[in-house]
Structures are given as C-alpha cells and as structure tokens.
C-alpha cells in the first residue's frame, strides 16, 4: 500500500483478467484494515458493477455499497472521515459500469475528489478506452511474470522454513501445471504469494477457478483475523 501511495493518491490498476485485480483490491482492503491502528486509514471496498446514476452523489452510493460491513454508518460520519483525509476508497471494476452510466460516474467521482482531495483513491479495471477522462489518475499496469520469473520468486521467498516441503511441492506443481492453469494469478507476484498461502492451507490449488478464488479469500481473511487477534 505504501508503494502505491508513494506514486499518487489517485491510481488506476489496469490489467487483463478479472479475478486477479479483484483479489488484489481485497488484499489492499485487508492490509489497510490490519494497519488501521498505526495509520488511522479507514478502507472502503466498493464494487462499481452496482453503480447507478440515480444515487444523489457518490457518498450515497458508497454508503449503500458498504452497508453490509459498516452497518448503520451515517452520511455525517462518512463526511467526517472524508474531511479528516483518512479514507482509502477502493473502487473495483471500472470496466463493469454500463456505458449508459459511465459519464455519470466520471462526473460524480470528479466532484467527490474535488471536495475530498486528501483521501486515497484506487480504481481497478481491465484496459479501458476512456482512461484519458480520468486526468488526475496515474495508470499502473499490472505486469505479468514469465514462468521462469514466477519460479524464481518462489525460490527466493522466505516461507515456512520449518516445513520446506510445502514450498517445494508447490514449486513443482507450479512448474508442471499451475503456471498455465491459473494464469492471471501465477504470473503476478502478489497473487502468486496468495496461491502459495492457499496451497499451505488446503494442500492443493483447485482446478476450478471459482473454488480457488473462494479459498484464496478465506486464507486472506484468516491471516487478517490472526494478525488482528495478535
């Protein structure tokens, strides 16, 4: 998170393949939550596929989206967070907004940031033809690792030195099949690490991506809860 905030307070994470970007955004959310005691930053994970132009403004949409996690949060409380400059807003899936509402969202987001400039804003998206409309955002392209680079990362990773067989078995699976069967995760440094954590927890990486995605998020949540409890 620190590396991203060093680049800009307004960032677009651009890359192909939907699962990897959403998982990365969830990781940023959980990581910021874990660090809240030290930083004071309050993260909000917002799925843009649910955006509609009939919301009064972006604050109303955000409150609607986060109501399941932040039950009963008021508009006044949200404005107080925004005015403090302690908000991290993770907007997931810009490319999932319908063409009919895209202009409305761009306008609402621009007004939102103009009012509350001191917060942090991260948007994830597939490569999108209209990034040029987001003039204040810095586009960060998610670069893919080659198979050799992914294997090298696993070799260098300090992971469970008490049980080296976990990493060794995962590396073998990565070399034989996982790099290609789970492309989009296996070629991304952060997501590859999450794959290894999932392998440690479940002793395998499921071939069906929706099951793997659920298990990976379960592992992230457990790690977050363990750190929170400690």
Model-derived regions, located:
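P-loop NTPase signaling cores
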Residues: 1-229
């Amino acid at each position: 998170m620190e590396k991203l905030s060093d680049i800009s307070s307004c960032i677009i994470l651009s890359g192909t393949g939907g699962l990897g970007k959403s998982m990365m955004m969830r990781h940023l959310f959980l990581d910021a939550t874990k660090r809240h005691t030290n930083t004071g930053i309050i993260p909000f994970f917002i799925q843009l596929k649910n955006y509609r132009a009939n919301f009064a403004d972006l604050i109303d949409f955000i409150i609607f989206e986060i109501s399941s996690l932040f039950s009963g949060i008021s508009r006044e409380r949200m404005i107080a967070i925004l005015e403090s400059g302690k908000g991290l807003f993770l907007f997931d899936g810009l490319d999932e907004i319908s063409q009919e509402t895209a202009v409305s969202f761009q306008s609402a987001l621009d007004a939102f940031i103009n009012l509350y400039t001191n917060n942090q804003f991260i948007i994830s998206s597939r490569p999108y033809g209209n990034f040029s409309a987001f003039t204040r955002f810095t586009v960060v392209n998610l670069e893919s690792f080659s198979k050799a680079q992914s294997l090298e990362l696993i070799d260098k990773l300090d992971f469970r030195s008490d049980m080296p067989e976990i990493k060794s078995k995962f590396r073998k699976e990565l070399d034989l099949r996982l790099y290609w069967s789970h492309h989009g995760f296996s070629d991304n440094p952060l997501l590859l690490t999450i794959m290894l954590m999932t392998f440690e927890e479940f002793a395998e990486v499921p071939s069906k991506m929706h099951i793997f995605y659920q298990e990976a998020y379960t592992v992230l949540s457990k790690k977050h809860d363990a750190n929170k409890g400690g």
